[in-house]
């Protein structure tokens, strides 16, 4: 073995290599290792979050997810397809003889001063197994709310909710919107000295000292609900529940908040206030929600414009007038060597953060959502769209990107 792959935690034995070669019917040459080494080096250098190996009838397509967008990396001939897929599965500790069922795997690597954990998943397709590798840089420091894109007012509201002794904090958004990263920022912002902090995550992506992290394993019955019920017997002060998926988890989270625990969790809703009817649909009594809820927030991830090459938008005047932002200066993506021609570098959170104290009477009375939204407008809390337009007007992202993520 050589290069980056020599530092894998799951390096294949000589016997595994020979077995893989016999199984796929190709010679056990070093070329497959070189190819995988090159692909992973490129993924690490590009800060890719995921690497996709997509089998086709005539070969294998490798794509990277960069700042949330899929980009083609390379295309390999048919002769390399099955040997490379087998090699990836070996490094992930997966069964190369099982191609009919989905599998999960794990590996670790050190590259360029980074300690990266990899989560692998396989899925049978008509042309072979699709493999996806999620790259998780364990050396990356936890970012503050400000570094994630939360403004001063939003950061202050989040910190105020975190200083309370108990209550529920819900973060909403679709898959891939950065909810887990923001929850980790919240845990990092807490003063955990003298307090027990526990998490239930699916899966555990980043590991933290002084925090007890539990990974959900639904195949053996360890769900969020069963985990949360057990967690309540562990004498915790602060709990992070990765997702509130069902009625039992929702009701247990409410119970935990009402009995003196600070609870963070996520929901899949379109905006922050939509968490209220979602929890009602899960069977939560509104008077109990009003007694426990402290803050709701929603977010999306937008790509940041590359500061080295962004340019004023050619239709700036029309766009500013169209969106009611007279005098705003919008920018557009161009592309340069600094951003590898993409026009964007990194991502930031487009968000809405709503402390619910003044909404509690309406929540307890199960008032129509029209009244809740009217109060929101009266109090001046910004919507996702309003914050997105403000971020674009500040030149941090493009208007096209804001409209794409919203």
What are these regions (language model features)?
Residues 1-12, 19-406:
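Short, flexible helix-loop junctions that flank or precede catalytic/ligand sites
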